[in-house]
């Protein structure tokens, strides 16, 4: 726990003076946070127990069947392969890089240690998520909008139906969201410590540790889902722009080097080196398996090809009627003899050709994905669990997310809030860039969940603001 955390936890009286929730007046911030983490963990463990020891097709988490089979194949000595033909177009016994190596190994390790019992992997994941996810939401919310918002943000993350439902599923979403929040938290700490270093004499070694931690956070996140790579240039650009001057640079040369923010550039090299170190084993494995370069996974080409296929016209459909077979039939037959890596690359080229052939259709198709990506209403095609999760989480909190975004814009333009302006902008960047990535490729509700994790911070800020306004209005309401 860093210095700022201890300062916040030692100021429960300040939280009580907000007079928004009387509970804050009798329970310290530290105790309240612990209660939130315990409750979040219980909800997620409950979800894990509900999903049980059987690995079956449940709404939104069908991929757990693939991960479970892959893990069992790995510990049986067959490597990353399937016994029969498998999604997306992997032949029996042939290597696959379509699925997260890291998550597969997580399941394999659990199965080796505790036997092939999926429920154990579910419970371990639920406990980790129950602690880390709300805790990171608290840290980010507290840093950007204050300690009360941090606590409300942690509470919303704990109660969000999607999050505790997916925490019990054997898929990458839960750890992936934690990895994204961890990366954002480290980025915030880096900029904060860089700004303080000149004033407080914070050691440079601490800052280097943060650059290394950022590399680990991003590396783990990439190994869970490589799509986050597309956000990294924007994250690094934000870091580069917001790093303050490096006091180690001599005064006579500072004016030139300041423009390049030399301290940030050096840090980037360290972070990128750590990332490459983490993903290198995967890249080397892929080279040996497919005899061609694959950085992490073989799924971007499949997703972009299927997501932009002319079969949709200008209106995207989340899932085609007969599922996997429909998608398989869309692959040109002359490409099917290729191995998975070669096929992924060929399909990416085909998908790009769809865009070049009809750019306007691509634009309209991308816009049509907003309906699927931001769906908050019940659907007759969805199961009861899906509809309850959708309406009871995103549907209920969407107005507060939008309100929080709206009022946070005003903070950016207030000079007295300049300290947190850059942090709010990074959250905006993530929401916009990550959403755009999926609108131009493949949009499903579960792909939106990392965005939800950030939007909940704005929802918390909006709720706090509304609480203050309601309290203010009470003074002018007649009493009976």
Each model region followed by its residue ranges:
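Start-transfer (signal-anchor) and selected internal transmembrane alpha helices
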Residues: 1-49, 244, 256-274, 423, ...
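Loop-to-helix entry region of an early transmembrane alpha helix in multi-pass inner-membrane enzymes
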Residues: 97, 101-108, 114-132, 154, ...
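Transmembrane-helix signature of polytopic, membrane-embedded enzymes
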Residues: 119, 131-159, 177-178, 204, ...
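Membrane-interface anchor segments at the N-terminal boundary of transmembrane helices
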Residues: 120-123, 127, 346-347, 353-431
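Multi-pass, polyprenyl lipid-linked donor-dependent membrane glycosyltransferases
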Residues: 121-128, 152-190, 208, 220-234, ...
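Transmembrane-helix motifs of polytopic, lipid-linked glycan transferases
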Residues: 123-145, 182, 186, 399-403
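Membrane-interface transmembrane helices that cradle and orient dolichyl/undecaprenyl
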Residues: 183-213, 240-251, 463-466
